[in-house]
From Swiss-Prot:
Example of a GO biological process term: abscisic acid-activated signaling pathway
Gene3D superfamilies found in the cross-reference section: 3.30.530.20
Protein name: Root allergen protein
Assigned protein family: Belongs to the BetVI family.
Amino acid sequence: MAVAEFEITSSLSPSNIFKAFVIDFDTIAPKAEPETYKSIKTIEGDGGVGTIKSITYSDGVPFTSSKHKVDAIDSNNFSISYTIFEGDVLMGIIESGTHHLKFLPSADGGSVYKHSMVFKCKGDAKLTDENVSLMKEGLKKTFKAIETYVISHPEAC
């Protein structure tokens, strides 16, 4: 098992960044970061617990697809947990990756985005520090792209 965490500050309020990064991710991510996200589709559910989504990644990304299931979502406290359970994004060595996201208010009126990841590896497989670093950097890049998109398109929230 491998665990990784990071946090990023944002000028956007917790409610605005939660809406963009969680509720409207399916439509905003391909617009904000088309070099990473080709499409995101809901396979099952309505966005709540149990919802299953499929992500198709753009050409140039080192993997093509992933599927994840929403484990918990709390719109009042701006948090979500989901588990990636399928796709080459798991690199053949990860059985599943559970992500916990929380958006907290900051003193300046913005927010702090906290993200923790727990990876269950297959058999004796282990994630390298480089693997974990690449995942963290990719997620940070996506967060900043969505933040920039929302600032440029305030009607999105």
